[in-house]
Amino acid sequence: MRRVLVVLSCVLSFCAVVAAPAAADLPVIYSGAYGYAHTTPAASPPGANDWTCKPTAAHPRPVVLVHGTFADMSNSWQALSPLLKNNGWCVFALNYGSYAGSGAIGVYGTGEIRNSAKELDAFVDKVRAATGAPEADLVGHSQGGMMPRWYLKFLGGASEVHTLVGLSPSNHGTTVDGIGLLARFFPGGSQFTGALCPACEEQIVGSQFLAELNSGGDTVPGVEYTVIQTRYDQVVTPYTSAFLSGSNVKNILLQNQCILDLGDHLSMPYDHIADADVLTALDPLHPRNPLCTPILPTEGG
């Protein structure tokens, strides 16, 4: 029933669509209702996982999209994946972190984060081998913006990744209430909490995992970091816990760009202002200047 209501809300509300400038371009739909209604987690989002794609001189590094806790590549990247593809990037996405059978019902990102980082490591190696690119760029939402830091710091990823962009990443943890809210949003998520969701416990402020991750500094040399966050994040709380410290970090608060952006944690992948910031982080020589238009919680726009 929730999925029916979600789809209906997209029909009754304005589902922002970027007009395709060329016939070959993929539609980019900035709507959380549209995106989160996708129920085929194994299906690659539009534009992703073309293993014949070769990077260009303009965009020499493939982009790997990393979803968050309880989510999957299909429901997370229905906007950003085609947007990147339309703008000339080779785009790849994965599902990771199945635990205690969670992947069987389409719930990912619940397993131990160290193991998820190993899955990401193997996937990036596969992408680099297929594309011939020595380095990749990573874009992640929620846990997907934080987990790659373990790969960069402890698994040799610093020599394989140029840029990490986090959308509301749980870099310094959150509260039990924040994780619980997230679990209730995704169908089946509430079945995989507590002991059935090691990643949930590891993202709580004060966990041993976070202490190890952040010991010795937030970043590693040679990697560029961008954090994009909303003041209205109700999952990563306080919202400032997403931000990183370091000379190679750019922290962006969306409301400093647009006071009409009321987007929350769930709307981040479907927020056209946040997604424009992603493009700028990946290609800083060609900065984007998105229009300041209303962005709604959960829905985006």
Predicted segments — roles?
Residues 199-236:
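The feature captures the conserved acid-bearing segment of alpha/beta-hydrolase catalytic domains
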Residues 23-42, 172, 177-194, 269-273, ...:
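Composition-driven, intrinsically disordered low-complexity tracts enriched in small residues
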Residues 73-75, 101, 175:
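Short N-terminal helix/helix-N-cap motif within the alpha/beta-hydrolase-1
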Residues 67, 91, 114-214:
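Serine-dependent carboxylesterase/thioesterase catalytic core
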Residues 83-103:
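Conserved alpha/beta-hydrolase
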Residues 1-87, 291-301:
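Flexible, membrane-associating and regulatory peripheral segments of lipid-active enzymes
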Residues 221-301:
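C-terminal catalytic-base region of ester-bond hydrolases, centering on the histidine
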Residues 103-119:
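Catalytic nucleophile-loop/oxyanion-hole region of alpha/beta-hydrolase
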